[in-house]
């Protein structure tokens, strides 16, 4: 599915694809030097709380080192009179709120008690980007996205939709197209402080029924 989508995008003249690893600093630096981006949107990461329990090294490499490399590239975009990065937009996660039971979440809530490595690293990303913003005047916008849903890939392939925890968990789900629209709007300018959820958690099986 990803390869098919990539083939569709190749028809656009302004589209470029570079296959690489976020944790490879040389690759990130070369991309910034070649394309000189004014707006950077970082959605690249190893996602998921469960997988971080059994594969912690993957999260440290992709989500911690990879994000650091992005920040450093933004910082050095100012070097030698080059056009600097004007705005960094990146995805965080609602998991940074830990076991907070108050809904809806607020940007004023404390987020210093993560309950997973994934959440801890995402919070680390937020703190690090804040420091870089203050030190190097890099405008940064964090998107504390809620759980995405969009089952079309599995439906097209005739696969079973997997529901964890017997469908008993509840979460604020966000449709993937709404996430895309939100990212595009944020790219145009930093918004007011707001979370991407409505405070109406529902079990995943209710979302599946919509399909």
Language model features by range: what are they?
Residues 25, 161-162:
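Short C-terminal boundary/hinge segments that cap the last helix of small helical domains
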Residues 88-92, 206-211:
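Extended hydrophobic secondary-structure segments that form protein cores and membrane-embedded regions
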Residues 61, 83, 162-165, 194-197:
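Short, hydrophobic secondary-structure boundary micro-motifs
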Residues 1-142, 177-183, 187:
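N-terminal Rossmann-like NAD(P)+-binding domain of SDR-like oxidoreductases, especially those catalyzing
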């Amino acid at each position: 599915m990803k390869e098919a989508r990539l083939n569709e995008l190749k028809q656009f003249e302004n589209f470029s694809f570079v296959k690489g690893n976020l944790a490879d600093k040389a690759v990130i630096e070369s991309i910034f030097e070649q394309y000189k981006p004014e707006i950077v949107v970082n959605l690249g990461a190893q996602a998921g709380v469960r997988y971080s329990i059994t594969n912690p090294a993957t999260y440290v490499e992709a989500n911690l080192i990879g994000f650091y490399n992005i920040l450093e590239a933004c910082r050095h975009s100012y070097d030698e009179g080059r056009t600097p990065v004007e705005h960094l937009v990146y995805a965080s996660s609602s998991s940074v709120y830990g076991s907070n039971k108050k809904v809806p979440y607020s940007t004023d809530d404390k987020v210093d008690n993560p309950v997973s490595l994934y959440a801890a690293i995402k919070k680390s990303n937020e703190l690090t980007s804040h420091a870089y913003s203050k030190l190097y005047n890099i405008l940064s916008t964090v998107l504390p996205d809620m759980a995405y849903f969009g089952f079309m890939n599995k439906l097209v392939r005739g696969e079973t939709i997997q529901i964890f925890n017997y469908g008993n968990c509840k979460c604020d789900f966000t449709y993937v197209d709404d996430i895309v629209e939100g990212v595009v709007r944020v790219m145009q300018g930093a918004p007011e402080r707001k979370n991407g959820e409505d405070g109406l958690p529902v079990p995943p099986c209710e979302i599946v029924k919509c399909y």
